[in-house]
Amino acid sequence: MRIGNLNVEIEFIADNIVRVLYYYGREAIVDNSLVVLPNLEKLSIKGESTGPSIISFSSESLSVDINTSNGELIMKDNKGGIVVKEKRRDLKFNEELSTYNVEQEFELSEGERVYGLGQHAGGNGLGQSSAYKLDYSGLSTTLSQRNTDIGIPFIVSSKGYGILWDNYSLGSISLRRNKLKVWFEAGKKIDYYVIYGDSIDDVIKGYRKLTGDAPLLPKWAYGYWQSKERYKSQDEITSVVKEFRERKIPLDVIVLDWRYWGKYGWNAFKFDETDFPRPKDMVEEIHKMGAKLAISIWPTFGKETEVFKDMESKGCIILGTTAFNPFKDECRELFWSYVKGFYDLGIDAYWLDASEPETGLGLVFFSPIHDVDLEIGKGYEYLNAYPLMETKAVYEGQRRISNKRVVILTRSAFAGQQRHSAISWSGDVLGDWATLRAQIPAGLNFSISGIPYWTTDTGGFFSGNPETKAYAEIFVRWFQWSTFCPILRVHGTIFPKEPWRFPREYQEVILKYIRLRYKLLPYIYSLAWMTYSIGYTIMRPLVMDFRDDQNVYDFDEQYMFGPYILISPVTLPSIIEKEVYLPSKEYWYDFWTGEKLEGGRMMDVKVTLDTIPLFVRSGAVLPLLGKNVNNAEEYWDVIDLRVYPGKNGYFELYDDDGITYEYEKGKYYIIPITWDEDKQELTIGKKRGELEMSKKIIKIIWVEKGKGIEHTKPDVEIEYNGKETITVKRG
C-alpha cells in the first residue's frame, strides 16, 4: 500500500500495539532493531477497504484508518474515539549525509499533554537550560546524549497512548498549537509503534513488551549509596564504611570514583598500588562490614594503557576517539573481559560513567562518532544508542557467567536499557535550589519513558560546603526528596558529604531520612517486583494514577511513590508552608500526623526542617520494616503494617533471596494483604511462591489522627508463618 511516494505497512504486535512503517522502494529495509526485542509475535490482521480511499486495519482494541488520498493516518479506540492522528510524514534526502531526514506531524487534542522523551533538565552550568515543566507544551526538545541530558524517543500522552520511534539518530520533538512535530537526522525508513491502554500503566507495560522487562536489582541496591569525587585510597574508603558502622548509620553501597588507576593511565582497569595496594582485601573488608562496592568505569582509555592498545589492535576503538565500539559483538565481549577483572575481585556494581559517550572532543551535539563508519552503519545513524550497547556488554557478560544480579549505574540511557539492570542518574548538576526544582520533572519524565531506575547526585555534583547552613539546607531538602526516588545516592565533588559532615541539626534530619528509607524497604522492594512482573513504574507523575483529574496534568513538583505515597518536595529556602494539591475522589492521610483529609483541593501544608509534605492514600496497606538494620540484606522478620482506612485496599508484600536470579524460576514468596472497608477487616493470606519463609512478627496499626509515622505502638500483633490465612477485625 502506498501513501504518496511512500510504501506503508501496518503490523499489530498485540491488540493494543501497532507498528507503522514507511519506506521507499518495493520492500522495507530489514535490519535488526537494537531497541525492540526480536521475534515478537504478530497478529494476523489484513487491511480492508472501508470507504473511498480508506484502508482500515482493526483489532479488538484499535483500528487504523489510512486515507490514501490525503495521507492522513488515524487510530481510534474501540468506541470510535480518536487516539492518534498523523497528518503528514516525509523522508527527505540529505545529500551531505547521503541518508534521509525523517519528518512527521501529528495533530493533538485540545488540552492533551505529552510526557517522556528521557531526561531534559540541564542545570550543570554547561549552557543547557533548566526546564521546570513536566509536560512539553510549547517546547522543542532535542533528543541527544549529553551530560545531564538523556534522549529517549518515546512519548506518553495524557490520553493514554505512547509512541516509540525505532530510530537512534539525533532527533527533535516540537509541541506547539496542538501539533507534534518530529524530526530525526537519519533514517532509511520511518518506523514507530503506537501503544494504547486503559491506563498509562498499560502503555508502559506495552513498551516493556516491545523492549524488555526491568530485572530486579539486588535488595542492597535499594538501600543507601554513599559516594564522592573521590575516595583517594584503600584506607580512606574502608575507613568511611567503618565510621558508618561505628555511628550505627545504615549503609549498603560505597562508591569508588575515577583515578584509582594512577600511574597505569586513564581507565586502565588496574589499581595503582601506591594508594590501593591490596584491592581484593579492600573488597573483602567492605563486605565483612556488610556493605557493597561500586567502581567507576569509562568507555574511553588512555592511549598509553594496555587496554587501549589491545582494543585498537582488534579494531575496537572508534576512529578519531579513544572510545570502544559497543556496536560490534566482539568488542562488547572484549570490554566485558576487562570489566570481569573487577567482578573476579568481588566488586558488586559497575558505574559506567560518561556513557554518552563523553570523548572530550566535539561540539555539544556532534561528537567525533557522528561521522565515523561503525561497521553497523554510520555514526549519525546510531549515535544515541551508545549507552544501550555499552550496558548490554556488561549485563550480558555477567549473566553469561553468574547467577548474581547485575547492577549498573550509568550517566546516559536509551530505549530498552531497562532490560540491562541499568540505573541512570541526572549527571553533573549544580547544587542550588533552581537545579533541585528542575530535577523533579526530569526524573518523572525519565520514569514515564519506561526506564524505572533513576537517581541524582543528591545535593548536586557541584555543591557547597556542608559546614555552612545555607548549603546544608539545600542538601537536607534534596536528601528528603531523594529518599523517595527509586535509588537513594549521595555524590559530589570537592566537599565530602557523609552525614557527619553537616551541622548537628541538619545531620539529625539526614539520619532521620536514611532510617525512613530503610523502614520503607519492604514497600520499595515489593514495588520493584511489580516493576519486573507487571511493567510497573515506581516514581509516578500524578497523571498516571489520577488521569481523570485534569488538575494534576501540570504538577511538576508532586508525584506518587508507588500506589500509596504522595510526595511534594520542598524546593525553596526558609519556607514554613507549601501549597499542595490532593487529588480528587480520594481521602488522604497526613504521613506525619495521621490526620485524614479530603482530596480534590489545594491546601497549605506546614513544613519544618525535618518534614516535607507527604500524604498516604486511603485504602493503603503499607508494609514497613519494624526494626533498625545496618543494611538492606538483614532479614525482614518484623513488619509494621500500617492500614489507612477509607476504602478497600490490597497489596502484595514480596520477598526473595535478594541476591540471585532464582526469582525468575519462581523462588520467591508473596504475602497477599487485603483491607475490607465495609467489614473493617484485614486479611493476610497464605503465602504464594516456592521460596520457604521463616516466621514474621506483623504489627498492625490502624492509622488515624495522632498515629503518624512515628507512632509505632501496634494495635494488634500477630505471628505469621505463611501457611494459613489470618483475619484481624478492627476493634
Swiss-Prot record:
GO terms for biological process: carbohydrate metabolic process. One of its GO terms (molecular function) is carbohydrate binding. Gene3D superfamilies: Glycosidases (3.20.20.80), glycosyl hydrolase (family 31) (2.60.40.1760), Golgi alpha-mannosidase II (2.60.40.1180). Optimum pH is 5.5. The active site is at residues 353, 356, 428. Optimum temperature is 90 degrees Celsius. Its EC number is 3.2.1.177. The keyword Mitochondrion does not apply. InterPro entries: DUF5110, Gal_mutarotase_sf_dom, Glyco_hydro_31_C, Glyco_hydro_31_N_dom, Glyco_hydro_31_TIM, Glyco_hydro_b, Glycoside_hydrolase_SF, Glycosyl_Hydrolase_31. It catalyses: Hydrolysis of terminal, non-reducing alpha-D-xylose residues with release of alpha-D-xylose. Keywords: Glycosidase, Hydrolase. Monomer. Catalyzes the liberation of alpha-xylose from the non-reducing terminal glucose of xyloglucan oligosaccharides. Has high hydrolytic activity on the disaccharide isoprimeverose. Follows a retaining mechanism of substrate hydrolysis. Belongs to the glycosyl hydrolase 31 family. This is Alpha-xylosidase.
